[in-house]
Design a protein with these regions (language model features):
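NAD(P)H dinucleotide-binding glycine-rich loop of Rossmann-like/cofactor-binding domains
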Residues: 35-42, 53-118
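Short amphipathic alpha-helix with an adjacent loop that forms part of the alpha/beta core around
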Residues: 167-178
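N-terminal Rossmann-like NAD(P) cofactor-binding module of classical short-chain dehydrogenase/reductase
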Residues: 58, 115, 161, 183-184
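C-terminal capping/lid region of NAD(P)-dependent oxidoreductase domains
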Residues: 261-270, 278-300
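Mid-domain Rossmann-like dinucleotide-binding core that forms the NAD(H)/NADP(H) cofactor-binding site
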Residues: 88-166
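Glycine-rich beta-strand-centered segment in the early N-terminal region that forms part
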Residues: 3-11, 19-63
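Glycine-rich phosphate-binding loop and adjacent beta-alpha segment
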Residues: 190-264, 297-300
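Short, glycine/polar-rich helix-capping loops at beta-to-alpha or helix-loop-helix junctions
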Residues: 64-65, 143-153, 168, 220-226
Length: 300
């Protein structure tokens, strides 16, 4: 048992599904109890032999400033030489989601075209950069000039497409003259509908999320994809990152190496204080945030 002080909490799209009683892959939040999610915390008191005062830990824990919990749901961070919020982004669950979804399901090959939606976000930005490391041509879809410019000028994507522009369909077509071999799906809705028109034979589609429909599931009506999957002999597969837990350690080491080498860059949107949680959620679901959304609760 140990007592910890929360430093950062992670705000993630999947949490929207925990705010309803709809059938989902994760239990809904309980009324009258604190949210729980991924946090970075500092140990301030401990009787556990492996955890000392001052240790920095990460885990799935209640959103409280100070809390006494068991050690079964936490891990020490491997290093404090990097910004701690990275353990909620590229060195945490979003990085694992990007890594395994792309490499284990998407299986990109050198020279192929990889398209990723929500490309400036915590998962999408890492997907695109890993695809570049693997020698692929990468096209990112994002909303607004600032995000699209970030993809091409900061992250070295080969092309960026703004889904908010009226000419989105044509711009996307121009960006993928040789078709699409891997589409990493984070958004769903009309964006996915347009991408599916350009799939190559044997395309792979890892489905990580469908954030466009999280607030309005009743409106999520679009073209039927089955015919395209058959015609293109394409593979579309949903996944939960937990299924790859046995390989988390290896993936973490590789991601950390790429970060240290400057091959993966990150963008973090930081709000300060628990009172900013509602606005952070709104920003996340409307696309107004930039990169990984975290809340800073206290200083180290």
């Amino acid at each position: 048992v140990y007592k910890r002080q929360t430093l950062y909490i992670s705000v993630d799209p999947y949490m929207r599904g925990r705010m309803t009683n709809a059938d989902s892959y994760v239990q809904p939040f309980k009324k009258g109890e604190p949210f729980n999610g991924h946090i970075v915390a500092k140990v301030i008191q401990s009787n556990a032999k492996d955890y000392n005062e001052g240790d920095i830990v990460v885990g799935m824990l209640p959103w409280k400033k100070i809390n006494t919990v068991s050690t079964e749901h936490i891990d020490k961070v491997p290093s404090t030489d990097v910004p701690l919020d990275l353990y909620l982004s590229v060195l945490g669950m979003p990085g694992q989601t990007a890594y395994h979804g792309l490499l284990d399901i998407g299986q990109p090959k050198e020279g192929e075209t990889v398209v990723v939606s929500a490309a400036s976000g915590a998962v999408g930005s890492v997907v695109g950069q890993i695809a570049k490391i693997k020698g692929c041509r990468v096209v990112g879809i994002a909303g607004g000039d600032k995000k699209v410019n970030y993809l091409t000028k900061e992250l070295d994507f080969d092309a960026g497409v703004d889904y908010k522009k009226d000419d989105f369909a044509q711009t996307l077509a121009d960006a993928v003259p040789d078709g699409i071999d891997v589409y990493y799906e984070n958004v769903g809705g009309e964006i996915g509908d347009e991408v599916f028109k350009h799939l190559n034979t044997h395309a792979r589609i890892p489905v990580c999320g469908a954030i466009s429909s999280y607030n309005h599931p009743e409106e999520d009506i679009g073209p039927r994809i089955q015919g395209t999957l058959i015609k293109k002999q394409a593979m579309m597969r949903g996944f939960l990152v937990a299924e790859f837990a046995d390989d988390f350690k290896n993936a973490s080491e590789q991601l950390a190496k790429w970060v240290q080498e400057g091959k993966i860059k990150t963008q973090v949107s930081v709000e300060e204080g628990f009172d900013k949680v509602p606005q952070a959620f709104r920003n996340l679901l409307t696309g107004d945030n930039f990169g990984k959304q975290v809340i800073k609760v206290s200083d180290v």
